[in-house]
Design a protein with these regions (language model features):
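Class I S-adenosyl-L-methionine
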Residues: 1-233
Length: 233
């Protein structure tokens, strides 16, 4: 139905209980496709990237890729190598998605950086839909989105970007922090993907999932002591 967008994400589907249907664009992260889609990527976030979560991480025996990964690489190359056609297709997808959601009595919302961190405010897409909500996570400070009241950004904490986190908080942004266990009193961002609905609480918590559970880079903030095998040490 859609050339570029999808809704096949369990967490995104939780938003339907609140009357929203999220559509997401998944590109290949970092430099996986030969183009850098995550200019502020860190070693920790690369290792724990949700690019290989769910079906994206299901590989047949002996294989290192699958149809999901191939599709994300193909879309990424399309974006960088035929930008105008890509943006035309994305615009058409958004229009279809708006109609799809509204026919089902839901509000369409869009996250264009499902597994990337591109400055979508530069490409004239969000401007075309001023009454539609867009939202993303980002590690890039200082993005110019004041002219786009329908675009919400949540800053992402990672290994080695504590100074940027402090600046983002000073600018009034919410910051998503991945924990092994979300501390008591920290607002949980795990209930849905609708970050634009979050109260302005500063820190919003996400629980480590998949590969992130084994992170030792500092990407995942530890609230539970790591047990060390003394015999292996």
């Amino acid at each position: 139905m859609f050339k570029l967008l999808s809704t096949a994400n369990p967490k995104i589907q939780k938003g339907t209980d609140k009357g929203y249907l999220s559509f997401i664009l998944h590109l290949a992260p970092a430099d996986v496709a030969g183009y850098n889609t995550c200019p502020k990527a860190t070693a920790g976030c690369k290792a724990a990237c949700l690019n290989t979560a769910g079906r994206g991480g299901m590989f047949k025996r002996g294989e290192t890729t699958n149809v999901i990964q191939k599709a994300r690489i193909r879309k990424t190359k399309y974006f960088f190598e035929n930008r105008s056609a890509f943006l035309d297709d994305l615009t058409a997808d958004i229009m279809k998605a708006v109609n799809f959601a509204r026919k089902r009595g839901l509000k369409p919302v869009f996250r264009l950086n499902g597994t990337s961190d591109l400055a979508w405010e530069k490409y004239g897409i969000i401007d075309q839909f001023p009454t539609i909500q867009f939202y993303d996570y980002t590690k890039i400070l200082g993005r110019k989105i004041a002219h786009l009241p329908n675009y919400h950004l949540t800053f992402s904490a990672a290994d080695g970007n504590d100074a940027d986190v402090a600046e983002a908080l000073a600018q009034g942004m919410n910051v998503a922090v991945v924990y092994d266990k979300i501390p008591e009193g920290v607002y949980s961002a795990d209930e849905d993907d609708l970050r634009f609905l979050d109260p302005e609480v500063g820190i919003v918590g996400l629980k480590a999932k998949g590969k992130a559970k084994k992170d030792t880079s500092g990407f995942v903030r530890r609230t539970i002591p790591i047990l060390v095998d003394k015999q292996a040490a």
